[in-house]
Structures are given as structure tokens and as C-alpha cells.
Amino acid sequence: MSEDVVKPASGRRQVARAVALSGVWLALRPRIGAAQAAADTLLNVRQFGAKGDAKSEDTRAIQSAVDAAATRGGAVFLPPGVYRSGELQMRPHVSLTGIPAWDYEHGFGSVIRLADARARCLLNITGAFGATIDGLSLDGAKLGAGVHGVWLNKPDYGKQEDTFRIERCQIANFSGDGVRLTRAWCFSIRHSMIAYNAGDGISLRGWDGFFLDNWFSGNHGAGFAAREENASCTFTGNRIEWNREGILIVGGDGYNITGNFFDRAGTCGLAILGGQQISITGNFIKRSGKNAKPGEYDSSQIRLERTRGVTCSANNLQAGRDDNGSGVWSPSYGIVYKELQHCVIGNNVLHDGALQQLMVDLGGHGEGAVVKDNPGCLSPQPKGSA
């Protein structure tokens, strides 16, 4: 694939090719005007000296391109290559766009690889209102300690919505969280893979987020965790798999968790502690509790404690072991619940749903706690299995 530099004086064919690669189309303008507009607002990082050869230090070149795009309401295009970089500061209303070609385990296409173990993060989106990160593989290279992939860190919520977008990206191998959001509101993360990070896949303090069609895979913390104030998030069509914890929500409200696949969490597949006004519907939750001690409540598919106004229905729960037929069978329990008020746990199916007990009632409920019609059976284990 050509890595030609896109310059304002380039011919229309070259500019049009760069435009097509970045997924940006200019329509309803004269052809010459469209080409010139693309050259002015679609900036190729090679134009600013980036090499993308997996050897050179490209931090200054990429940052210069982002800063230039911010002055003209433009976008920055990274042709396929491996760009070694330290911390980059995104700017408001700038799109950082590449070609997504990553696979399940590795980054390909347009890759930005962390080159500074002392960095706080790779992409800092603090204050970058309306920014877009699209089609990139962000590789932490397992450098440093507590280095995040994408980081938003505000002292307060401010008066303006963040409205950033992360699309078609792989964010992997960071020594901190894949995405760390502190006081974020109004944003979306879609069609991405957030995997193999030493912390959480996504750590959220904030609200008004959309998480659609993502993989949260193999993170050493939770696939998704919200441990401080959090609210009003939608999870649809995600796969949350092989993380130390699946989804952990502490004290949140206003969640819609629908149509997701939870697989092989180290502890609970889905834990909601102190939450309210949450809908949990139509999810498949499979073989949770891989690393939990058998008989402890962390060895469960779903755990609901101190919840109000929660609906948990039409979910399918199944026990199991590792893909290759080895490893421990888990979990011990299907749904563990306590201190419910105005909640419904009903019409879930637990065929082969757990090893010891399908439904565990720890009591302490207030009024309006309805738990009924959750059919199923314990999972048989082959004799001599681990």
C-alpha cells in the first residue's frame, strides 16, 4: 500500500485516494474544490514527518498534525504502519483516523505503539470535546506501571459534554486500564476491542455512555468497572470474556444491559452492588467464577446486592469449564441476591446453570421483591474432573 505524503499541491488522484482510505467523502462540490478541501482539512501524519516504521520516534510528528488539524476543524490520517509514540494530547473536534486491520491477538493496520514507559497514557482526551478516535490499534507494549491507553481526567464535570467517540479500535497491552474515564459524560465506544490490559478494560467515573458491539477480553481487572459515581449507560451486543471480573457496577443507576455475552469471568459475570433503576435483559452468562474459590459468592453468574428498581429477566445462564475441556468447573451459584427493594428476578433460564445452587437468597429484602419462575438444573460434572 502506498505511503505517499498528501500535500496541498498534490494531484487530485492522490488526494482522493487518501480521502477514500480515511473513510471521508466530500460530496456536492466541484471536483477540484473537493480535492483542495480534502488537502486542507485531511492531514496525513507523513506530511509532518511521521515514519511509521516501528523504529522511529513519531510523537512530535503526530502531535503536530493533531494541533494543525485543530486550527482548521480537520482530521488526521495515519496510513498503515507502526508509529512509536509517547503521550499524545487530543484536541477538540479533531478526528484521529486510521485503517483498522487488527486481529484477535495483535494490532495491524494503523498502529500507535507506546514508546515511553514514564507516560501517563498514550492518548489523553481530557478537554478534547467532540474528538473521534477511529480505526486505530493502540498498543501499550506492556510498558511502565499504570499507563492507560485512552485517558480522560477532569477535576469536575464542567459545563460541556465530552461527546468523544471511540470507533473500530483495538486498545491492548497497557499496564493500566485500556480506557480510563474520570468525570466523563456523553460519549460512545463502539465496534472496538479492549483487551489484555493490566487494569480494567474500561474504568468509568461518570455517566451517559453508550457501549455497543465491543469485545472486553482478557483484562486483569474487570472488563468494565464503575466504582465511583456512575449512571445512565447502555450496554448492547458486547462480549465480555476472560477478564478477572466481568462487569462490576457499584452504586450506579439508569443502566440498560441487554443482549450481551458474558463468558469465563474470573469472579462474577455481572455484579451490581448498591445500584438502582437497572434493566438486565436477554444476556447469555456462561461459566463465570473461573478463579473464585468454590462456595464463595464471587463464584456466581449474577450478583445483586442492595439494589432498588432492578429488573433481571430473560437471561440464560450456563456453567462450564475452559475451551479445551480442562480447568475448573464453575460457578458454584447461579444468581446471588440480597437486600432487594422493588426488584424482579424472573423468567431466567438456568439449565446446567451452576454447580451447587441455582438461586441463593441472602435475605434482608424490602417491599416489592419478586423472585419467581427461574427454571433450571445443576450442571453435572464428569467424575474425576478438576
Which residues make up each language-model segment?
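N-terminal secretory signal peptides
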Residues: 1-10
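C-terminal segment of N-terminal export signals and the immediately downstream linker at the start
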Residues: 9, 29-48
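Extracellular beta-strand-rich solenoid/capping regions of secreted or surface-exposed proteins
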Residues: 62-71, 83-97, 104-134, 139-162, ...
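Acidic Gly/Asp/Thr-rich repetitive segments characteristic of extracellular carbohydrate-active
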Residues: 45-77
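Parallel beta-helix/beta-solenoid
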Residues: 91-92, 118, 128, 133, ...
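Short glycine/acidic-rich loop motifs that flank beta-strands on beta-rich extracellular proteins
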Residues: 85-87, 106-108, 116-121, 141-148, ...
